[in-house]
């Protein structure tokens, strides 16, 4: 598996609800463990809650937080929900950064079924981005600061997404509350277009997976890419 002091690799998914991100993440974990590759817990990333003293005491972190704030102020109207997603995106960024520099977990692969990019798209959901170029530049800036992160763009047919969402337990996300399929399809198409506009210029090098296939087949493709391009022995 290469050098023992290598930073962990992080796989981060983004895409429509019902795309099968979580299911595919579990399939990847299973394949990696069968190959005796260490799968690192994402708990330290997901559960990380930044403290404002982290921003005050570190100029680097403060400068990065300002980038997230700039992105927030490019979306109208500013709401509590958008602020929540801005802080969530920053939490993921800081969690990944700390995960890499802590030195406690090395030589393995960590899988996030959603993360920074998903939070940025959610922050702009049904809002007006006053300057898309600047918004995308904010995302690109913070993404480029991270090492060893593989972004997976999950494409899905909206009708399959609807079918999977309807099969979930009730009380899910915002879109799952829409009961009319035609209205839900319309909202998914809007979000799909938003994903494309926001990510096509800001997330360089992302791999695109068509999630209409079975999770195991998609997991195999991602594992092959991960091992071949980003986790090969030195």
Predicted regions and their residues:
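Short beta-strand-centered segment that lines the nucleotide-binding/catalytic pocket of NTP-utilizing
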Residues: 35-51
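Hydrophobic positions on the alpha1 helix immediately C-terminal to the Walker A/P-loop
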Residues: 24
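ATP-dependent small-molecule kinase phosphotransfer cores
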Residues: 46-127
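Hydrophobic anchor at the beta1->P-loop junction of P-loop NTPases
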Residues: 13
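NTP-dependent small-molecule kinase module
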Residues: 162-234
